[in-house]
């Protein structure tokens, strides 16, 4: 019964909860109140890297008129490694809803991160630029922008051209450093990726001034 389940779930681990609700889910897919209860339990227990949670969210986002479950679904797809599906849901949210500015900026950044994992680096950068147009001094956006450049470095031309991408990345990390919330991470990233800069001799033979 529901009362027994309510007594059990606070002490249950993720595996136990999935085991308890998986069969019930198969028989109760049209019971929206039941699905919302499962979603709440799994979310509160941080038990989101599993197929049950994805299945529950997939149904709820179809029947709920708000974007709440769609955002949860996109984030959960990302957490489970389904980056293309995650990108598609984030894209749909941005197209279909007039989001409040902070939420829109965060959704753009999450969309950019999904695109990064798909190796769609130029598209990912475009989304970070849109996020920064909303929040110009947002260190987290500059951090992600830098990490996108790092991720895509190996796909840029010859060895020299690949190393020059780290100039762009570190420039982003320097901008991120101005935001106290991410300052420590930004400084570590600067120290890590500055080591990959091309040396002066390499720059000279490639007709580029280091700076």
Where in this protein do the model-derived segments appear?
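Solenoid-like repeat scaffolds
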Residues: 22-28, 57-66, 92-101, 130-135
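Short coil/turn linking the two alpha-helices of tandem helical-hairpin repeats
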Residues: 46, 98-101, 113-119, 146, ...
